[in-house]
C-alpha cells in the first residue's frame, strides 16, 4: 500500500528490519516520540501498546523501554560518526563550552555549525555533534587537544571557534591556532557584571527586592513579587527583573495601600531602574542585530552607532559599559574580512542541554552515560521533517550495540553507580 499524502510505502514500513524483531514503522514511531516530544521510553512503550490495540495487527511486537533507548543510542552514534558529511561542501565553525557538570564529571561537547550566517539565528537543526569529551577536570591544554581531535574527525579545521569568555577556552583556542569569536550574550553580560556587581545602587536595589520577596512570599501581595533570578549568570537574565520593576512603577498609583507599603522601596530606586532599563534595551538591540543579521563589519558599525547614541550619553556607569562594548566590537571587526558574515552566538547550546537535562538521571553518581547519544538524534529531528526522511533501517543495521559499548569505553568515565553495585555485591 502506497501513501500518496506522505510519499512512503506502508507495506515496506511494516517489514521487520534485518537483524531486529521490530518493523521499521515501530522503530520510526518510537524514535519520533522520543526525539520530538517529552515522552519517556516507558511512556512510548505504553503508546505502542495502545497503537497495537487500535491498528489490529499493524504492530506485532512491543519493544521494551531499554530497546527503544538502544535504538536512539545507535542512531546517535551514527550521527556523530557522520557529522563531517554535513559540512563536506562548506566551511564550519565550532561551538565549544564546558557546559555541564554531572557529579564529578565535566562534559565538554564540540558542536559544528555553518560558518556562514544563515540570515537568521542558529537553529537546532543547524547543529551537528562532533564529539563528546568527558573528564574530571579541564585545562587549556586538554581543551586544545579536544579541539584538534574534533578537527581530525571532521577532516578539516574549523573556520573559527565560538566560546564564552572562560580563560581556559580562550587559551585553548590560541594553542590550537584557530580564530576565536566571543559569544555575544556572555560577553555583554560580563561587561554588565564588571560594572554593576559591586556597585552600591545595584546591590541596594537587589537586596531590597530579595528582602521584599522573602518577607512576603506567602502573603496576599505575593502575586506581585519579582520573578526568580538564576543563581548563576544572573546578568544574563536581568531583563525580566528590570521589566517587572518598570511595570510596578508604572502601576504603582493603582495599587492598594497595603501593596504600596510593601513595594515602597521601588520609587526610591526609580532613577536606577530607568538606567537599567536603558542598558538592557541597548544590550538586547546589539544581541538582536548579531543573532538576526550575523557578525559583520556592517552590523558592527550599526551597533557602534547605537551605543554612541544611547548609553554613551548616559551617566558614568553607562558610559563605562558602553566603552567596553565599543572596544569589544572593534576587536571583533578586526577579525573579519570585507563581506564576511559569521555566527557569534552560542545560545543554541543552552537549548540543546536543556533537552538533555530532561532525560538524564537525577542520580549524580551516574555521571555522563550513553544517554548523551540521544542528543545528536534530537538535533537531527529538530527540523520537523526528519521523522519521514530519517533512514532508520540503514542506521540500525550499520551500528551494533557493541559499537555503542566500545564508544562508551573510549569516551566516558566509569559509571559510579555500576561501580557501587559491584563493590557492594562482592562484599
Task: Locate predicted features.
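Basic, low-complexity segments
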Residues: 1-16
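A general alpha-helix detector
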Residues: 29-30, 355
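Acidic/histidine-rich catalytic cores and adjacent linkers
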Residues: 163-175, 211-427
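Short alpha-helical "recognition helix" segments of helix-turn-helix
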Residues: 44
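RNase H-like nuclease fold core
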Residues: 16-22, 26, 32, 36, ...
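Glycine- and acidic-residue-rich phosphate-binding/metal-coordinating active-site segment common to enzymes
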Residues: 187-212
Amino acid at each position: 500500500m502506497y501513501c500518496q499524502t506522505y510519499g512512503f510505502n506502508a507495506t515496506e514500513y511494516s517489514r521487520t528490519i534485518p537483524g531486529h524483531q521490530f518493523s521499521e514503522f515501530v522503530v520510526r514511531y518510537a524514535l519520533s516520540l522520543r526525539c520530538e516530544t517529552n515522552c519517556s521510553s516507558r511512556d512510548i512503550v505504553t503508546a505502542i501498546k495502545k497503537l497495537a490495540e487500535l491498528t489490529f495487527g499493524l504492530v506485532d511486537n512491543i519493544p521494551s523501554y531499554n530497546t527503544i533507548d538502544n535504538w536512539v543510542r545507535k542512531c546517535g552514534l551514527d550521527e556523530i560518526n557522520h557529522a563531517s558529511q554535513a559540512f563536506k561542501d562548506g566551511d564550519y565553525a565550532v561551538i565549544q563550552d564546558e557546559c555541564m557538570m554531572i557529579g564529578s564529571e565535566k562534559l565538554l561537547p564540540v558542536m559544528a555549525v555553518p560558518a556562514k550566517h544563515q540570515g537568521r539565528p542558529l537553529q537546532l537543526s543547524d547543529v551537528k555533534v562532533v564529539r563528546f569529551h568527558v573528564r574530571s577536570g579541564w585545562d587549556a591544554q586538554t581543551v586544545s587537544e579536544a579541539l584538534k581531535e574534533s578537527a581530525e574527525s571532521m577532516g578539516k579545521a574549523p573556520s573559527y571557534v565560538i566560546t564564552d569568555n572562560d580563560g581556559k577556552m580562550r587559551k585553548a583556542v590560541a594553542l590550537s591556532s584557530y580564530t576565536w569569536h566571543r559569544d555575544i550574550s556572555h560577553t555583554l553580560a560580563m561587561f554588565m557584571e564588571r560594572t554593576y556587581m559591586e556597585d552600591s545602587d545595584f546591590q541596594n536595589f537587589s537586596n531590597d527586592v530579595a528582602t521584599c520577596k522573602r518577607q512576603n512570599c506567602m502573603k496576599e501581595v505575593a502575586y506581585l513579587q519579582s520573578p526568580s533570578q538564576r543563581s548563576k549568570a544572573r546578568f544574563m537574565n536581568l531583563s525580566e527583573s528590570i521589566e517587572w520593576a518598570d511595570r510596578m512603577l508604572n502601576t504603582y498609583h493603582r495599587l492598594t495601600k497595603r501593596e504600596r507599603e510593601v513595594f515602597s522601596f521601588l520609587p526610591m530606586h526609580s532613577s536606577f531602574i530607568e538606567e537599567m532599563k536603558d542598558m538592557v534595551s541597548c544590550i538586547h538591540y546589539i544581541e538582536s542585530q548579531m543573532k538576526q543579521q550575523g557578525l559583520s563589519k556592517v552590523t558592527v558599525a550599526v551597533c557602534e552607532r547605537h551605543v554612541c547614541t544611547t548609553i554613551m550619553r548616559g551617566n558614568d556607569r553607562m558610559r563605562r559599559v558602553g566603552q567596553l562594548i565599543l572596544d569589544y566590537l572593534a576587536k571583533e571587526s578586526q577579525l573579519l574580512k570585507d563581506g564576511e558574515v559569521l555566527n557569534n552566538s552560542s545560545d543554541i547550546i543552552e537549548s540543546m542541554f536543556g533537552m538533555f537535562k530532561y532525560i538524564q538521571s537525577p542520580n549524580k553518581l551516574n555521571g555522563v552515560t550513553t544517554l548523551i547519544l540521544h542528543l545528536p538524534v534530537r538535533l537531527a529531528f529538530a527540523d520537523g521533517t526528519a521523522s519521514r526522511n530519517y533512514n532508520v533501517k540503514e542506521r540500525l543495521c550499520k551500528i551494533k550495540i557493541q559499537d555503542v559499548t566500545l564508544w562508551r569505553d573510549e569516551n566516558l568515565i566509569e559509571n559510579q553507580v555500576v561501580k557501587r553495585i559491584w563493590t557492594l555485591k562482592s562484599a
